[in-house]
């Protein structure tokens, strides 16, 4: 398994110059040696990136809730939230030894930027400032996971709010639980949105099943819903759980994955976990687009933030991501972010207003992937 960051595509758009600089980056890394604060002593920078961005995340132990003999969703949400709060208190946000730090983890991206800048200066080349279509300074993806059929009705409320700012979004449906009538999908696509596959059953077990049974279930779903095959180009796993086996299979059906956070605190793995970068990266041909803003559920129900603090946390992270020329990925859930829950609703409305004026390219995952790979391929 090998990764390739989109950062190089943004700052060195000529493929020949990029290849030369990438080789120089490797030589500089050899001279510098191990970077303090990074949890890897890889021999090459490419190995370091792959180790931190993928290997550490997929090596996380299987959470207890996914080992239960029954579906963890039978446990009432307040009880689940209380358990996460307890775990959260055992792993304080400010723990300096944590990797990745939360809500921002700059160390890998800082090292990458430093190496590329030094390599360019030594070669007498000027790196480009990361920009996106129309000179935008970064990109934003608005995504929504639909975790039950009851949540389908909440999509319209969110889209009314997003259309107020002329913003597209992407919506993930669970094949066994929240797969909608075709009319819902057609309406979203006509509205400029994208749909993606959100797990298969969202029971926490998919990544830990044997690969033949995973492959068979995906094949059965697409055989039964052939019309969705060209529309479903991406995937996000339930609870953001991932294993090397599942990640290696996804490219058989999908062109991008949204499962890995750059940093998440209080999630299914107990403490901090994530891929530690705000730049999308290829994993053996599959584009991984990290989830880079904290999810609504955790801010509201685990961190217990009020609306103002939710919004300030989102705004601060949005600015940090865009300042790097990265991709800010937002994930909200209609079950939590809806007009009946004013804390989350007001925070999301404020975030959308900020996004609309942030000088960012607000797009969908497939459009982002197409544009980024166009840069990569020259």
Question: Model-derived features: where do they sit?
Answer:
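An active-site-proximal "capping" alpha-helix that borders the catalytic cofactor pocket
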Residues: 216-225
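Short, surface-exposed connector motifs at secondary-structure boundaries
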Residues: 164-169, 225-233
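Structural recognition of alpha->loop->beta junctions
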Residues: 191-195, 228-231, 355, 359
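Glycine-rich phosphate-binding "P-loop"
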Residues: 142-147, 197-217
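Acidic, His- and aromatic-enriched active-site or binding-groove loops in soluble protein domains
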Residues: 192-202, 254-271
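Active-site-proximal binding-pocket segments
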Residues: 230-233, 239-250, 255-263
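Short coil-to-beta-strand
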Residues: 188-196, 284-291
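Terminal accessory/targeting
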Residues: 1-183, 244, 251-253, 263, ...
